[in-house]
């Protein structure tokens, strides 16, 4: 038998979760806020899998990255301000250019955008 206090606690937890959910915003995939979330995930992924990125870069020496990304990877402070102003096409190119984009980066980016209440849509 379930106690009423357990039910009340469950209802309170659900209500708190709903209240804590961020407001949703629909943005263009090229919006700088979307790019900053994507780059934040990318920088975190590089930090977590640095050897893979080094091997990828060694195999693709002509692949270039914005200098701001390298600075953000090795600066363990708040790097988000370093990443502003990188053109959306460069963000897309570097993030989608690695073999693990579909399996690791895209799901992490989707999760991060959703956690921030951001959804993307291509403008008509």
Curated annotation (Swiss-Prot):
Gene expressing this chain: PAU17
Stated name of the protein: Seripauperin-17
Organism: Saccharomyces cerevisiae (strain ATCC 204508 / S288c) (Baker's yeast)
GO molecular-function term, one example from the UniProt record: structural constituent of cell wall
Pfam families registered for this protein in UniProt: SRP1_TIP1
GO cellular-component term (any): fungal-type cell wall
First and last residue of the signal peptide: 1-20
Keywords: Signal
UniProt similarity note: Belongs to the SRP1/TIP1 family. Seripauperin subfamily.
